[in-house]
Amino acid sequence: MRLPAQLLGLLMLWIPGSSADIVMTQTPLSLSVTPGQPASISCKSSQSLLHSDGKTYLYWYLQKPGQPPQLLIYEVSNRFSGVPDRFSGSGSGTDFTLKISRVEAEDVGVYYCMQSIQLP
């Protein structure tokens, strides 16, 4: 007779609370830049992305037209292999920035910031 109560306890343990969901907000939503000029995109998280292991799980992706998203920056400021050094990431806690020192025509696309400290 104890099984139903134990099962209910397990189910309750796995119900996510909506108040704990992390919301990511990027600004600006659209940006027009002349080639050769710098560009900056901000990303704000509703909660700190600093993990107990000391790492901050914030990533930047670029999706070029007709292509899947490609990783640019991982853990706030580390450039992924092959990413040009004109791309840089910075920030901590809840506030992050992606900077492009000199925009090139090939940089056109949709930029996303993503967290992985909390997964669905």
Curated annotation (Swiss-Prot):
Disulfide bonds join C43-C113. PROSITE patterns: IG_LIKE (PS50835). It comes from Homo sapiens (Human). It holds the Pfam family V-set. Residues 75-81 are annotated as: Complementarity-determining-2. V region of the variable domain of immunoglobulin light chains that participates in the antigen recognition. Immunoglobulins, also known as antibodies, are membrane-bound or secreted glycoproteins produced by B lymphocytes. In the recognition phase of humoral immunity, the membrane-bound immunoglobulins serve as receptors which, upon binding of a specific antigen, trigger the clonal expansion and differentiation of B lymphocytes into immunoglobulins-secreting plasma cells. One of its GO terms (biological process) is immune response. Residues 114-120 are annotated as: Complementarity-determining-3. Residues 82-113 are annotated as: Framework-3. Keywords: Adaptive immunity, Cell membrane, Disulfide bond, Immunity, Immunoglobulin, Immunoglobulin domain, Membrane, Secreted, Signal. Its main location: secreted. Residues 44-59 are annotated as: Complementarity-determining-1. It is found in: Secreted; Cell membrane. Residues 1-20 form the signal peptide. Residues 60-74 are annotated as: Framework-2. Immunoglobulins are composed of two identical heavy chains and two identical light chains; disulfide-linked. Residues 21-120 form the Ig-like domain. This is Immunoglobulin kappa variable 2D-29. One of its GO terms (cellular component) is extracellular region. Residues 21-43 are annotated as: Framework-1.
